[in-house]
């Protein structure tokens, strides 16, 4: 440091150096803070994307399809089998509930009771009771016929098994309706069979219409032979006709008119008549 510098110059140099270092530090800090903010935004966006409840559109569609066409559960299959052996109970008091009917038939192993109500929710005075076997249903009918239940004598009749239409209507929608894959496979099989049939028919037609080289050579030879025979016949006829004309001229005899000349004369006469 020079001794000739004044105190003010020394202070200004130190101040400028401090400001320069401080500005560089602040610039690097700003760059670091910008980078950290970008990194934080990227991590946050990726986290929100990965933690979204819907991983893809197919998952949502699959849930909707399952809701629209529920699978046949074990309970539903059991219920369909349970509807085979049942009795109809009529003349029930309007206060009779499902638990009352179950307690009445408990000795005959009932597995299901269906109370019949109208649209207003009022009892129709009847219910259907289903059993494990047909023997249990018959025993319950014989034993509990005309039993008094809450002041009313019940009437029990054997319930006929459901018809085919009822079984199909009670069947879940997913069991009745074929899946998309099966329909698409059937459509693919039909189209492939049609294509196969069309290909085979076209191949048969092409095989029937195809002509080999030997057949072509044979046809050409036949045509050449027929043409040669025709030319030979015409040459012989002209040779036979020429000497006869020459002999007639030598003998000063009239030449017999040919068929062509006669035909020409007839045509001329017809034209003159017209």
Swiss-Prot record:
Residues 21-44 have a biased composition (Basic residues). It comes from the Eukaryota. One of its GO terms (biological process) is poly(A)+ mRNA export from nucleus. Residues 85-161 form the RRM domain. Residues 148-160, 230-245 have a biased composition (Polar residues). GO terms for molecular function: mRNA binding. Residues 181-190, 200-211 have a biased composition (Low complexity). Keywords: RNA-binding. GO terms for cellular component: nucleolus; nucleus; THO complex part of transcription export complex. Residues 1-63, 148-217, 230-274 are annotated as: Disordered. The keyword Glycosyltransferase does not apply. Pfam families: FoP_duplication, RRM_1. Residues 1-20, 45-63 have a biased composition (Basic and acidic residues). PROSITE patterns: RRM. Residues 263-274 have a biased composition (Acidic residues). This is Uncharacterized RNA-binding protein C106.12c.
